[in-house]
């Protein structure tokens, strides 16, 4: 009965989650950013966003390379569909593993007892609309669920060592490997994977096993970190640098929590889960076939760490730590997204719950009936809340408006802005303001140009490329090929709709190394905390830098000053670390200077940057005459 009811619950939740996620299928602009990198990988340009500039534009390393493999296997299939399929499958797999892990947690105490397994925490998670939104989206959210579900299931198995069978070194190595990969799934998951590895090291009974844990858990993340430092010249992805993950915005973080909680009253299931968990702990048995006796080199602390209660504390503590991390960061601009993983962790111990049928063995029948009644009542409360929350209007009228909080329902925002209920491909985003016009502008400038967004959604401001009048560059060299660059915030939809030879740059620093090294603005919209002036972009390229070649709202003096500021030796070193050809010498130099490059910041006002760097302020022409 227990096993049948567990699998029925798993199947029911997976079907509901899959159906609900498919009804809200989409690919986010940030998801398209990842696909631009995958396009470059498939084209042989390396893991970059723009050719000739080594920027790690994606937070999840594992998700990037998983999509790369999927795109390679998929061949002619559109990358958007590959991302959609992988995200959906991994989301469902994560939910299945969560429930199987929780079922395994309770299984030993249910041996020989009659019980029905019912979904509880799993229902809560899939009822929250953002959980179904980000089950697709093209972001790493599905991979996050699959990873957390797998780690939870494996940690539960590890916490239940059998007396009749010694621990398998293969399983131990696999668990250490999975825990070590946490930082490749998302950088902040190092808190989760690191804690799991520490628990394993404490419980390990021999030095040989400790060495195995360290090697299996540390080899891949350490190897990739060395690659990141040498190839990108940074300690962290460019996305972390752009959002200054070392900073804190506690007040904005609390606004984000409130924004996530208010539409769904999330406190209700969380409050109900506490007495539910306590009742389940009261009713559980201590089965004799688990290892309860002392063993050589296996002391009290090791036994306490390698136990189901410790693993429950681990997953709940991980959820709390992740939530605190994101609250400190200020949350995100996407409604609910970054709090889904903490919620998933907090609900894991009650993903499914056993309803014990009274048998008079451990409790009197009357006590057993009271216990069943209490558990059933709490479960009905959770199920009722789930039904209500699943049909919640969410953020309501504010879902598609960028209000003072800076938080929007990203799926609804892009559905409204593109006119597509399910924006799935880059072509769907051509109906987003300015997107169709950018293709026209690129086709109309065969000699090369920098495109700046204008106030008119149907046109772009153009800055021509400097071309030698004789057709040859100084010194008799052939003239440079026409180049195009586009300066825009939505670099995902833009990057996927233009060729890989078009440089796509942003002002917030996700794909622009110059913007990434500016200071974080204190009161800016969360996730968009940096804002590089377009004057820098004109100065940092082969573009005309004087009137009338530049738009009237650009200050030519600022362009001149920005061009001079780019000659700052430290700034040139940072830019050369990602733009100079990668050689062994460059790689080793980047490794040695990656800490310095990660900490380096410039002032976004060119004049102030010149003063900071100790350079002379050049004399330049004033603004253009006004008619």
Swiss-Prot record:
**UniProt entry tagged with the keyword Disulfide bond:** no
Q: Which UniProt keywords apply?
A: Cell wall biogenesis/degradation, Glycosyltransferase, Membrane, Signal, Transferase, Transmembrane, Transmembrane helix
Q: State where the protein is found.
A: Membrane
**What biological-process GO terms show up in the record?**
capsule polysaccharide biosynthetic process; cell wall organization
MF annotations from Gene Ontology: glycosyltransferase activity
Matching entries from InterPro entries are given as: AftB-like, AftB-like_mycobacteriaceae
Mark the transmembrane ranges.
81-101, 115-135, 138-158, 183-203, 211-231, 263-283, 307-327, 338-358, 370-390
Q: Which GO terms describe its cellular component?
A: membrane
Q: How does it sit in the membrane?
A: Multi-pass membrane protein
> Major location, coarse class?
membrane
Q: In which pathway does it act?
A: Cell wall biogenesis; cell wall polysaccharide biosynthesis
Query: Where does the record locate the signal sequence feature?
Result: 1-28
What EC number(s) is this enzyme filed under? 2.4.2.-
Q: Which family does it belong to?
A: Belongs to the AftB family.
Q: What does this protein do?
A: Involved in the biosynthesis of the arabinogalactan (AG) region of the mycolylarabinogalactan-peptidoglycan (mAGP) complex, an essential component of the mycobacterial cell wall. Catalyzes the transfer of arabinofuranosyl (Araf) residues from the sugar donor decaprenyl-phospho-arabinose (DPA) to the arabinan domain to form terminal beta-(1->2)-linked Araf residues, which marks the end point for AG arabinan biosynthesis before decoration with mycolic acids.
Name used for this protein in its record: Terminal beta-(1->2)-arabinofuranosyltransferase
Q: Which organism is it from?
A: Mycobacterium tuberculosis (strain ATCC 25618 / H37Rv)
Gene (UniProt): aftB
